[in-house]
């Protein structure tokens, strides 16, 4: 018999009477976000909902495609949309360095700049700054122990260009060298929020310190105190910037000549999510969840590094404390088994680079596990990658053709594999969402993972 786990702070009505929570602060232009719970998962913390943003709805739980530099690598926006993606996440660190947040601002914000017409998010840039590693001589990855598949040894939110560089942590912020030209930069919570407001996403994140799981308890405690102070400062700067009720005339010519509706969309106030840290320590994780939930954030992110076998426990520690009326994002996690775990424990949003990164390197998701398309056995396999898959790749090309492209080092290879992988993960989450609505989540989970993990 499954034990029933409930969150604190609020009790929802029975199924059939969804709760809608609109978020609006004094001085802000309009409701910036609305989160409606459609149905809760019996016996666990999971739920299906709808997150409304100024640029469209996100049906949660949902997978967020990572467009690090305002692009999903090897795909155009139409291909991303056709894969079922509803929301894209850009990286503040990379867009600040290139092309520069003011250029993105002058181009109409990240959505218009990259021609993505749906909801957008930006992270704070903190993970990339701290994952440079030199600040404490250790690398950071999202999961500290993974399977033996070599393709998974790449940290999930660690861009290829994030080679170790100099980074120095202070109480007020972090200084680091640009990986592009060696120039020195200093990021504070206020600076991160200013950059993200320029980038113009619908949902942004507070600046936090992402620690290495190998750090001792004393340092984890110090870093957590810093993260909480930075959260308060991020929130204060966000409120200051979002309090303006007039369109900023300092913006570039493309926005000054925009229609009123375009200006309204571009200047809509973003929702700000606070990030829970605390490493692998239960006391620190719970302490952080209490501290961050006491602040006036619109939603929450769970950050930091996890041991794969401990991830479910750590997520549950946090979610049993956070208020359930606000959306929750698990940062940098996106493997199929982890998606089921997160959703069961109340996570609404996930982001991860793996679908496209693995695709570009010839590793492809299927319901029976990953395949390496360049293996010899696929050279004469004229079946689609997945027989019942409705993605563009599977409807038009064979395994043999995709394998041929990879062996020939053709650019189309990574595109076709990425289309399939993104479709696979996005639609897996959509099917999980539907299983919550249909009251068969646990049956669907057991059936899928039995085939995928072969247990």
PLM feature segments, named:
Residues 1-30, 239-269:
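Intrinsic disorder/low-complexity segments
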Residues 31-242, 376-379:
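Non-catalytic, usually N-terminal nucleic-acid engagement modules in DNA/RNA processing proteins
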Residues 31-50, 58-67, 71-74, 208-214, ...:
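C-terminal extensions of enzymes
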Residues 56, 88, 123, 196, ...:
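Conserved, mostly hydrophobic/aromatic
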Residues 85-86, 116-120, 200-202, 268-272, ...:
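Short, well-ordered coil/turn segments that N-cap beta-strands
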Residues 192, 223, 227-230, 234, ...:
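Alpha-helical packing segments of well-folded alpha/beta enzyme cores
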Residues 212-217, 221, 298-303, 411-414:
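Glycine- and acidic
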Residues 225-228, 237, 241, 271-385:
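Glycine-rich phosphate/ribose-binding loops and adjacent secondary-structure elements
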């Amino acid at each position: 018999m499954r034990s029933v786990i409930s969150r604190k702070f609020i009790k929802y009505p029975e199924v059939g009477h969804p709760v809608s929570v609109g978020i609006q602060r004094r001085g802000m232009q309009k409701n910036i976000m609305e989160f409606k719970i459609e149905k809760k998962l019996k016996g666990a913390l999971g739920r299906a909902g709808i997150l409304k943003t100024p640029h469209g709805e996100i049906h949660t739980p949902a997978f967020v495609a990572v467009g690090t530099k305002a692009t999903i690598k090897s795909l155009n926006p139409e291909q991303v949309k056709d894969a079922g993606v509803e929301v894209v996440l850009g990286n503040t660190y990379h867009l600040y360095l290139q092309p520069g947040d003011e250029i993105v601002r002058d181009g109409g914000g990240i959505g218009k700049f990259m021609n993505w017409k749906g909801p957008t998010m930006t992270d704070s840039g903190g993970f990339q700054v701290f994952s440079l590693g030199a600040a404490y001589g250790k690398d950071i990855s999202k999961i500290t122990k993974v399977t033996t598949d070599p393709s998974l040894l790449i940290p999930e939110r660690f861009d290829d260009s994030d080679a170790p560089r100099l980074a120095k942590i202070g109480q007020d912020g972090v200084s680091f060298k640009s990986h592009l030209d060696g120039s020195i930069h200093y990021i504070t919570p206020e600076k991160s929020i200013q950059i993200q407001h320029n980038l113009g996403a619908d949902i942004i994140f507070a600046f936090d310190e992402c620690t290495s799981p190998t750090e001792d308890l004393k340092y984890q405690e110090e870093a957590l105190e810093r993260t909480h102070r930075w959260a308060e400062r991020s929130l204060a700067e966000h409120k200051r910037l979002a309090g303006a009720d007039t369109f900023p005339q300092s913006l570039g010519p493309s926005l000054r000549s925009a229609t009123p509706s375009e200006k309204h969309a571009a200047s809509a106030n973003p929702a700000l999510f606070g990030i829970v840290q605390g490493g692998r320590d239960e006391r620190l994780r719970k302490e952080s969840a209490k501290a961050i939930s006491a602040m006036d954030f619109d939603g929450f992110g769970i950050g930091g590094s996890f041991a794969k076998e401990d991830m479910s426990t750590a997520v549950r520690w946090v979610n049993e404390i956070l208020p359930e009326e606000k959306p929750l994002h698990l940062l940098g996690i996106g493997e199929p088994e982890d998606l089921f775990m997160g959703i069961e424990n109340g996570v609404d949003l996930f982001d991860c680079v793996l679908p496209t990164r693995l695709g570009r390197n010839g590793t492809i998701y299927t319901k029976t596990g990953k395949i390496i398309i360049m293996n010899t056995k696929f050279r004469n396999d004229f079946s689609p990658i997945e027989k019942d898959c409705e993605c563009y790749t599977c409807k038009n090309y064979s395994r043999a053709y995709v394998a041929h492209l990879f062996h020939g080092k053709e650019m189309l290879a990574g595109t076709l594999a990425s289309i399939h992988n993104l479709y696979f993960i996005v639609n897996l989450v959509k099917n999980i969402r539907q299983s919550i609505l249909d009251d068969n989540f646990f049956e669907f989970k057991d059936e899928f993972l039995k085939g995928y993990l072969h247990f």
